[in-house]
Every structure is written in C-alpha cells, then in structure tokens.
A protein has these predicted regions:
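N-terminal targeting or regulatory segments adjacent to alpha/beta-hydrolase or S9 domains
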Residues: 277, 282-283, 290, 298, ...
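Compact alpha-helical subdomains of small soluble proteins
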Residues: 302-346
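Edge beta-strands of extracellular beta-sandwich domains
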Residues: 238-265
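Compositionally biased low-complexity segments at domain edges in trafficked proteins
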Residues: 258-285, 291
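Short strand-edge motifs at loop-to-beta-strand transitions and within beta-strands
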Residues: 218-222
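Extended substrate-binding grooves/exosites of carbohydrate-active enzymes
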Residues: 1-213, 223-225, 229-239
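Sec-exported extracytoplasmic/periplasmic mature domains
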Residues: 14, 18, 115-116, 290-291, ...
Length: 346
C-alpha cells in the first residue's frame, strides 16, 4: 500500500508539471535496495552520522556505497546538521556535547565530504536558524532545535555560519572561531580561522604566528601559545578579525552543559572499572553477556507494554518505528546510539 501511494503521488506530480523532476527525502533507516527509491526521478537522504549516532566517516561511506551500487542514479543530501548552543565551548569537542566547537568539527567534515563528491545533485544543511521544537529539552534550551547556523533570535551567527560564508560568499571577510571561548586551560590552544581570501596571517599580542595559504578547503588551523591574556588578530587581505584568550587554571563550567543526573562533562567522567554508563553505545553494551541479558529483558518489557496498549500510541520515536522493517542495516545503525541518546529520543 505504501509503495502504491508513492507511485500515485509521483504520477500526479508529473501530470501537474511534466517539466519538474520528482524527489523524496529518505531517512537513514531506509535500505538503499528499497524499491521506494525507484519511484522518484532523483533520490535524497537525511543522514545524521556523527550526531545522533555513529561517526562522521559513515556519511562518506554511505554515499560512496550508494554511488558504487547505483552510479547512474542521482543521489542528494537532503538533511544534515548538529545542535550547538554558542554558550558551550570545548578544547575536546565530542559528538553530543552541544558545543559550538563540535558543530564546527561536524560541518568542516561535511563540507569536505560534499566538495569531494561532485556527483551529489544537491545538499541541504539543516538548518539556517534555530527553530521551535516543542518536544525537545536538551542542549540547555527548552523547546528549541539548535541545529541552526544562527540563533533563534537571529542575534548570533554561530562559528559554523562563517564556514559556509567562506564557500558561498564573494564578499571578502575573515572570521576567527572561538571568540566566545575565552577561558582556556590548555597551554597551547587550537584556533580555527575561516575566510574566502587566499591567505591568512594570525597575530598573538601583535606577534605573527605565521601566514597560511588557502589549500583545498577554506579552513586554517593555528596552534597558539596560551599564557596570561592574549589578543588574537586574524588578517586576510584588507579584512581583520579580533578575539581574546585568557589562560585559566580550572575549566570554566559555564562552557559545559550541566544536566542533573547525567555525566556528560569530559573532565568529570569517572566510570568504575567493570561498569558501563549511559554514555556507552548500544553496540558496546550488547558485546557483553550481561548486556545481552539486559537487552532481552527490555525487549520483553516493550512487548508487554505494546500488548497492554493494544497498538495505541506510545509517543516519541516508538510511534515512528511502528511498521518499520527491521533489517541488518537498521540494527547496525542502532548499535551506534548511546543509551543516553536513545532515552532522549524515546
């Protein structure tokens, strides 16, 4: 029935306007061998490897596998992104920490991945602005999806905004990332600069840290000595940008998401030997005997709850999963989720 509905919609779209190709945004759970992909003129996928699950390189692997299997099919990237609260910063950005720093790591990878694959017919960064999402309470904001390159109130352009400006804008500019990351404990800190100019020179308290020429991508990385107070000045052509650093003896807790009952701070994680935590992936837990037994108990509880509800709505991701075909690809992807992420999505 689902396939027939999509075929009917595809035919209707062609009748209404034969000049326009049809397409469809597919979520990552859909196998690339699904017959639904044969219906529209061109295909596209929403992928969130490196944010909700898995690693960043899995985005590359997914598209390479698809293109190798179907070299004559058009494939696009219909949705990708990572939430970031610009108040949160880190010298050790990690998936799921909601830092502005990790959002840059994420989008730098995606920008490179896209640039290296010219056969992607279209790509859609998700999203330009943070937007309302009633069911969310995460990343320090209630009721917001923070995947935007600009904050909800349109007042702050996050660092990742300037990454895309470096690619898409002809207006000369230079931007130093991490201007909101002032207090830093590391003796040598990494500073990233984005620009659409051919070269960048970075100064620390007036002393040049070197000139870098633009390579294949418009990202420039500098190792900056961090002692006392430092004023950074990036120069690219006639453009300049200034920011400030300050050496701190202790991490600034304002830079880290504080969640009651959840260990998420990289400098606070203390898991006793022989134990696992909500920050471990489903795959790692299932690799243990006790983990398999726990999973079996959970499945039994879910089945009992479904019988109790007699097919009624349970809310959250559970409703989305109804009727979904469980396949090896879906199971492998699910193993990439941490327990914490699964609980947040339930």
């Amino acid at each position: 029935e689902l396939l027939e509905n999509h075929r009917a919609l595809n035919e209707l779209a062609h009748r209404l306007d034969p000049t326009r190709p049809t397409t469809m945004a597919n979520v990552f759970m859909l196998e690339i061998t699904s017959p639904i992909l044969e219906i529209p003129d061109v295909n596209s996928y929403n992928l969130y490897f490196g944010w909700y699950l898995g690693e960043l390189d899995q985005n590359d692997d997914f598209f390479d596998t698809y293109h190798a299997k179907y070299p004559d099919r058009c494939i696009g990237f219909s949705e990708y992104g990572a939430d970031a609260n610009p108040a949160y910063q880190s010298a050790h950005p990690e998936k799921g920490d909601y830092t502005e720093t990790y959002q840059c790591v994420y989008h730098e990878h995606m920008a490179k991945m896209i640039a290296d694959r010219p056969w992607l017919w279209a790509t859609h960064v998700w999203n330009m602005f943070d937007f309302a999402a009633d069911g969310r309470d995460e990343g320090g904001k209630n009721g917001e999806n923070q995947k935007g390159l600009v904050t909800f109130d349109r007042k702050i352009k996050k660092d990742a905004f300037y990454l895309y400006k470096a690619y898409w804008s002809k207006q000369p500019f230079v931007h130093t990332c991490g201007s909101r990351y002032v207090d830093r404990t590391e003796d040598v800190t990494k500073v990233t600069v984005y620009t659409n100019q051919p070269q960048v020179e970075l100064f620390a308290n007036g002393k040049s840290l070197g000139v870098q020429q633009k390579g294949e991508y418009p990202f420039f990385y500098f190792d900056v000595p961090n002692s006392g107070e430092t004023t950074l000045t990036a120069k690219a052509g006639d453009c300049t940008d200034e920011s400030h650093l300050r050496h701190a003896n202790e991490p600034n807790r304002d830079y880290v998401l504080q969640e009651e009952g959840a260990v998420i701070n990289w400098f606070e994680i203390e898991t006793p030997p022989g134990y696992m935590s909500i920050n471990d992936t489903i795959g790692d837990i299932l690799a243990t005997t006790r983990g398999k037994l726990l999973a079996l108990r959970i499945v039994q509880m879910v089945r009992a709850n479904m019988k109790k509800n007699k097919g009624g709505s349970t809310g959250g991701m559970a409703d989305m999963a109804k009727g979904m075909k469980i396949n090896k690809s879906l199971i492998d992807m699910g193993k990439g989720f941490t327990v914490k992420r699964v609980c947040m999505m339930a």
